[in-house]
Amino acid sequence: MNIQHNLNLIQQKIETACKEENRNQNTVKLLAVSKTKPISAILSAYQAGQTAFGENYVQEGVEKIQYFESQGINLEWHFIGPLQSNKTRLVAEHFDWMQTLDRAKIADRLNEQRPTNKAPLNVLIQINISDEESKSGIQPEEMLTLAKHIENLPHLCLRGLMAIPAPTDNIAEQENAFRKMLELFEQLKQVLPNQQIDTLSMGMTDDMPSAIKCGSTMVRIGTAIFGARNYSTSQNK
């Protein structure tokens, strides 16, 4: 597994997708999804220039964060999995970003538990854009209520939205979901002009070009960088 080669391929695909939309490649950030991957794989990605990583499991993520901090390696860590209220403290204390915020209760706990010597925790509201019962996230019509709640929490910084649309090979269906997200993103920026709303996290290994076409500013890629995961699943590549 040549991680540097894989990262180069992904960056080329990002560049191609951006050129087709007359976008600067620098407007799309690559988040390497490193869940279930060993420290050695993350280190290889870091040595190839990758500095932002996404983890789905709290304890696994914290162990990796602590290892790299002990080595003096400064990485940016995003929590991208569903979060139970009894695990909020670890996310608040260790991660830089939390992308799956979908409840005021979780927001309150993260705000209370964020160390005061750290910068505010960057958060994204997760939208259940395909209305799937199996997926986390709030309904689109609930977005503004939660966003205004977060706005009043001093140790959180609302940066935008995140979504995991229902997997499909149909390009039109992909783009339909992503365009809905872009509309919500623009609405959020208009309603909260004083917040740093600049991040629309959508697009994974199989639908990245469609996501970039529809305005994504952050793509979450795991399989195409690190290879197949170490357990059997068909979703959330």
Curated annotation (Swiss-Prot):
It comes from the Bacteria. Signal peptide: none annotated. The keyword ATP-binding does not apply. The modification N6-(pyridoxal phosphate)lysine is found at residue 35. InterPro entries: Ala_racemase_N (IPR001608), PLP-binding_barrel (IPR029066), PyrdxlP_homeostasis (IPR011078). Keywords: Pyridoxal phosphate. GO terms for cellular component: cytoplasm. Pyridoxal 5'-phosphate (PLP)-binding protein, which is involved in PLP homeostasis. Belongs to the pyridoxal phosphate-binding protein YggS/PROSC family. This is Pyridoxal phosphate homeostasis protein. The lineage of its organism: Bacteria, Pseudomonadati, Pseudomonadota, Gammaproteobacteria, Pasteurellales.
